[in-house]
Amino acid sequence: MGLPRGSFFWLLLLLTAACSGLLFALYFSAVQRYPGPAAGARDTTSFEAFFQSKASNSWTGKGQACRHLLHLAIQRHPHFRGLFNLSIPVLLWGDLFTPALWDRLSQHKAPYGWRGLSHQVIASTLSLLNGSESAKLFAPPRDTPPKCIRCAVVGNGGILNGSRQGPNIDAHDYVFRLNGAVIKGFERDVGTKTSFYGFTVNTMKNSLVSYWNLGFTSVPQGQDLQYIFIPSDIRDYVMLRSAILGVPVPEGLDKGDRPHAYFGPEASASKFKLLHPDFISYLTERFLKSKLINTHFGDLYMPSTGALMLLTALHTCDQVSAYGFITSNYWKFSDHYFERKMKPLIFYANHDLSLEAALWRDLHKAGILQLYQR
């Protein structure tokens, strides 16, 4: 039997979208809770702990001029103050690599650890991230530092098409983008500023293939732009090492790739950040512990790239705004803002977008996050 054709096909598509939207709306309207911190976890809810933790992941623990500090909103919230641990290291760099860390993380599969991965590859990669700039997301600025770090995290959701949010996005101190971040032709809706580009090698290369004809013909590049590697596999460590050394990838799925084609010709270690596997574990356990983990899709599941970037910003910035992320009326918009024809969002088993949507909704209601909706 062939594929449905003509009016019957469109009727079937509309019915499918309507049913999907109804089911999601019912789920989304339910009260969504998140797993609390494990027994024996450190208490990081004190006012002093929040300021100390900010200093550990950025170049200063400021924020005095902010009209609204997200960490104070966390402190006031009866549920989220028990989930956030702002003292956990966000980034992994050379000084943190010890035999004890190897022994512990080698018990867990990527992206939560190094089980089955080469010690030589991990060690040689981290040895290149040996400067203090590798430990902090925000390097000390050359000029007068802002008194409040305001961050925009830009997802690729269709809600941004026609939004005219570009100027608002660019007004932030730092702008995070990810995966197929098409800018040309959509400047009015998504802005032009990019401070950080987050990805796994897999999502980056898949985006270049899948969205090439839609305008994503190269990874964002720029003198002050930095890249955040999500270590989902050994290939992320191999690509990162090759990028810093300025040599072709010597092995694996990306053998022969020239990193400068992705990241530009002058890509020193200071251009790259690496998320800590412990940080990804913490985010998954406390915020995005999906029921998919206990199914036969468990080995596939991990938080989406957008979720990891948004939660990274929430652990390092003073104010965070999210654009292009899933909302309760997602079915009104195309999957991505740069698509020429309406394409419904598909829920794949490797991410739990329903759980992520509920989290963004609740963080927005708590005043911890400003979620763009329309």
From Swiss-Prot:
One of its GO terms (biological process) is protein sialylation. GO terms for cellular component: Golgi membrane. The chain crosses the membrane at residues 8-28. Its EC number is 2.4.3.3. Disulfide bonds join 66-148, 151-317. It is an enzyme of class 2 (transferase). It is found in: Golgi apparatus membrane. Glycans are attached at residues 85, 130, 161. CMP-N-acetyl-beta-neuraminate binds at residues 156, 179, 304, 336. Residues 1-7 are cytoplasmic. The keyword Transferase applies. Its main location: Golgi. Keywords: Disulfide bond, Glycoprotein, Glycosyltransferase, Golgi apparatus, Membrane, Signal-anchor, Transferase, Transmembrane, Transmembrane helix. Pathway: Protein modification; protein glycosylation. Expressed in skeletal muscle, heart, kidney, placenta, lung and leukocytes. It comes from the Eukaryota. Residues 29-374 are lumenal. It catalyses: a beta-D-galactosyl-(1->3)-N-acetyl-alpha-D-galactosaminyl derivative + CMP-N-acetyl-beta-neuraminate = a beta-D-galactosyl-(1->3)-[N-acetyl-alpha-neuraminyl-(2->6)]-N-acetyl-alpha-D-galactosaminyl derivative + CMP + H(+); a 3-O-[N-acetyl-alpha-D-galactosaminyl]-L-threonyl-[protein] + CMP-N-acetyl-beta-neuraminate = a 3-O-[N-acetyl-alpha-neuraminosyl-(2->6)-N-acetyl-alpha-D-galactosaminyl]-L-threonyl-[protein] + CMP + H(+); a 3-O-[N-acetyl-alpha-neuraminyl-(2->3)-beta-D-galactosyl-(1->3)-N-acetyl-alpha-D-galactosaminyl]-L-threonyl-[protein] + CMP-N-acetyl-beta-neuraminate = a 3-O-{alpha-Neu5Ac-(2->3)-beta-D-Gal-(1->3)-[alpha-Neu5Ac-(2->6)]-alpha-D-GalNAc}-L-threonyl-[protein] + CMP + H(+). CDD domains: GT29_ST6GALNAC2. It is a single-pass type II membrane protein. GO terms for molecular function: alpha-N-acetylgalactosaminide alpha-2,6-sialyltransferase activity; sialyltransferase activity. Aberrant O-galactosylation of IgA1 molecules plays a role in the development and progression of IgA nephropathy (IgAN). Genetic interactions of C1GALT1 and ST6GALNAC2 variants influence IgA1 O-glycosylation, disease predisposition, and disease severity, and may contribute to the polygenic nature of IgAN. Catalyzes the transfer of N-acetylneuraminyl groups onto glycan chains in glycoproteins. Conjugates sialic acid with an alpha-2-6 linkage to N-acetylgalactosamine (GalNAc) glycan chains linked to serine or threonine in glycoproteins. Sialylates alphaGalNAc- and Galbeta1->3GalNAc-O-Ser/Thr epitopes also known as Tn and T antigens. Belongs to the glycosyltransferase 29 family. PANTHER family: ALPHA-N-ACETYLGALACTOSAMINIDE ALPHA-2,6-SIALYLTRANSFERASE 2, ALPHA-N-ACETYLGALACTOSAMINIDE ALPHA-2,6-SIALYLTRANSFERASE 2-LIKE-RELATED. This is Alpha-N-acetylgalactosaminide alpha-2,6-sialyltransferase 2.
